[in-house]
Amino acid sequence: MEELQGYLGIDRSCQQRFLYPLLFQESIYALAHDYGLNGSILYEPIENLGYDNKPSLLIVKRLIIRMHQQNLFFILVNGSNQNRFVGHNRSFYSQMISEGFAGIVEIPLSMRLASSLEQIAKSHNLRSIHSIFPFLEDKFSHLNHVSDILIPHPVHLEILVQTLRRWIQDAPSLHLLRFFLHGHPNWNSLITPKKSISLFSKENPRFFLFLYNSYVYEYESILVFLHKQSSHLRSISSGAFLERTNFYGKTEHLLVVLRNDFQKTLWLWLFKDPFMHYARYQGKAIMASKGTHLLMKKWKYHLVNFWQLHFYLWSQSGRIRINELSNHFFYFPGYLSGIRLNPSVVRGQMIENSFMIDTGIKKFDMIVPIIPLIGSLVKAKFCNISGYPISKSVRADSSNSDIINRFGRICRNLSHYHSGSSKKHNLYRIKYILRLSCAKTLARKHKSTVRTILKRLGSELLEEFLTEKEEILSLISPRTSSPPHREEGIWYLDIIHIHGMSNHS
């Protein structure tokens, strides 16, 4: 237990005891605004002001004065009440305070991860989502099995609070955290509904991301600790290892089960394989290994019991699916990924005899998933369920260039993200749908036909839907009538956000 605490950096001297008074500092709300996800904390809603949104520190001053005059909890009571409170509704002030509070509780985490953040700043390319795919291409082609893991949502509210207690020792801040959680509709249930999480994340994006990341950090840190202990397994008994890693005493029941069932073999099987790899994006993770199917089943058993006994979370075993990489493709993230066997024939000769050798090379393949992308286009009303392009309604004062730029920007974003796929025919189909939908939208606006629009704006439409790479290729080989179906994939190290239509995993 002491070693686990040391690994996680749980030191009382690093805990923050005086965070609550920071809620009364104007600079905290300014920082929350500058570094916020949507930059909305200091902007008054239109329904409150009646004129355009403008950044205003006057709102913050009013809030702080009211917080000094009254109890903070009185301000937050009935946060959804639309009655006016100092000229604004209570939910607006509640959101401001929650965003400011999220900025405050990030302080201990920032101090703890200072060294890691410095390393990340030096390796700017590692921030790109595409940086994970070269790793998958290099490692996964030699592995046998993969587990698709849907990380359960944090459930019991007190578990979130207890997790943050390892970083924050300020009692008023923890009470305020409980107040935020228990005061939100549908957050007082044992198992948090996905709909409630989606609603909460939209209303308080920064606050939600901090809570979720702290939960995932706790889960992954213990797994990393266990994996690092594997180098000592050959010098100690599995029983002693189980005694040392009892997960803060919360997994005593799990350890009893492990001692009774797999005392001799489980932990050795879990960690003796050096080819176990783990990757995560948002709420989905994959774990792949060169080991047997039995090894992956034991990992699945371990994870399910860990979630149940450490986070008091009843996780269905169906959230972890084990498949062979050789005949299974998995979504991660925005790609359909799997192992493809490239057959090849080698001609050999010994003295006067020649012979042919059939062989195959494993390659990690990334495919653009057509069905989820079509579903995203249907949801955005670019086409029907059969993939047939349809027109979109536009404002009467929208110019042709604005409409074309809008469609072209979506097309370029999708092409940019899916540039790593070696098979582009699915992507070309999506681009065709967007281009024809754009033409139909223009025809609807001008009350004309698609053929007339294509004749009038044909070259302009074509150029807008070309990527930079395709423009260069068109200049080099202008006679090429259609793009090749197979080409080398390109990974861009400047992508830090997935377009909504690409994030269908």
Curated annotation (Swiss-Prot):
Q: Which InterPro entries does the protein's record reference?
A: Domain_X, Maturase_MatK, Maturase_MatK_N
Query: What top-level branch of life does the organism fall under?
Result: Eukaryota
Q: Name one GO molecular function term.
A: RNA binding
- Where in the cell does this protein reside? Plastid, Chloroplast
Which cellular component terms (GO) are annotated to the entry?
Answer: chloroplast
Biological process, per Gene Ontology? mRNA processing; RNA splicing; tRNA processing
The record's keywords, sorted A to Z, are: Chloroplast, mRNA processing, Plastid, RNA-binding, tRNA processing
Main location class = plastid
| Family the entry assigns | Belongs to the intron maturase 2 family. MatK subfamily.
PANTHER family reported in the protein's UniProt record = MATURASE K (PTHR34811:SF1)
Against HAMAP family, the record matches this protein to: MatK
What does this protein's UniProt record list under function? Usually encoded in the trnK tRNA gene intron. Probably assists in splicing its own and other chloroplast group II introns.
Name of the protein: Maturase K
Source organism (scientific name): Illicium oligandrum
